[in-house]
Every structure is written in C-alpha cells, then in structure tokens.
Amino acid sequence: MNKTALITGATSGIGRATAQLFAKNNFKLVLCGRRQDRLDILKKELGEQTPIHILNFDVRNREEVTKHISSLPSGFSKIDILVNNAGNAHGLDSIEKGSLDDWDAMIDINVKGLLYVSKAILPNMVSKKAGHIINIGSTAGKEVYPKGNVYCASKHAVDAINQGMRLDLNEYGIRVGAVNPGLVETEFSQVRFKGDTNRADTVYRGFQALRPEDIADIILFVVTRPYHVNIADLVVMPTAQASSTIVKKEL
C-alpha cells in the first residue's frame, strides 16, 4: 500500500491507533495534532516503518489549517485518504447550566475543524477525481442523551456533513463514509470531565469498552475495500452497550 493518508487528532486514542496500524500497512502518513511532543514521539516510533510528516496545528484555527496543508512537501501533498478524527466532548451539563466556552470548543473542533481540514484537502481530490474521506462521528450523532445536548448536536452535524459530502462529491468519484463509535476507552472522558480521573474511570467500569485499536481495525477495513465499494455509514458499539444510556455493567 503506497497511498498517503492524513489523520487529524493523531496524538492519542483512535487517531494514534489508526496511525500505528496504517504504518504497519505501508501507508505514507501525514499526522496532525496540537501536541508537538507527542507528534515527535509518534514520528520516531513509526518513522522506521513508513515515511511520516507531522503537522502541529489546532483544527480550530482555519488560517493555520490552510497554511500547513497547502505547504505540504511534494512527497506528501497528494492526500489519498483523509481521516477526520479530531474531536472532543467538554462537560456534561444540562442546557441551562452549560458552559459557553465548552459549547464553543465542541462546535469549533468537532464541526468547524472538520470542515476546515476537508476544505483544504478537497481541491487535490477533486482535481484527480479520486480520494477517500472518513469522518469519525459517534453514536451521539445518531441519538440524543440527557445532558449531551451540544456534544450530540455537534456529532449530528458531523452525520449531516458526511451525508452532504457524499452527495456533493459523488460526481468526482470521491468515497465518503463515517465510522460512528460508541464507548471507546480513550482520553475522551478525562477531557470531558476536565481531568477528573475518578469520574472519567467510572464511565468504563464494569464492562469491556471498545479499544482505540478496535476502531483502527475498522477504519483500515473501510479504506482497503475495492474502490467500487464505499462503506457510507457504520455504527460500532461494545457488546455491553445497547444505546448511549443502556450499558450492561457488572460492578
């Protein structure tokens, strides 16, 4: 496999696991993230397996997104696969108690950031009439749960954007699909609960949550299908999870 893949949010969780698996399968990688130290470690870890280029920027900053992606070196500039993985949840509050800063962060990262990166990547895909965009959504984009309000709204937006992309880009032969995970044990809950490790740990206690590697396996499967096959929308949950609010736990 000699295709070039760009992965946002590559320094942890699903993004990191996807980078590791793609490297093993000989994809050239452009890895994006906000934490330079983690990007450096990842490049050192994976650089012996495949060519790696790292980009340190925040997807919320559209000028930085455009600048970094437009200035990719020639060996990495023709992106074949975009994995829009960067995303976060901030807070778990009823709507009347929600933080405006939390709302801004979720909309800016989960929705606008995805759009900024996609906009920067698309001209090349359109010109060559080929490419594959994987949008990492969530089961929160398929239903709404108590106190999930704005996070669920942001992931419903990802679901709508994914559908819209697939319609708009059909004439160019670009594949577009979403992978929508349920409960995956990552730094997600630590970020949502702002470093409250005890509260974050309770989210995954009493059942086997998905691992980042599980989602990476699925992403690899999606992007390695024959080109006439497009997996447009995929939902994956742990066996113990039936919905956002129904999880069989044995405590």
Regions found by a protein language model. Name each.
Residues T11-S12:
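Conserved glycine-rich cofactor-binding loop
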Residues A178-V179, N198-S244:
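C-terminal helical subdomain
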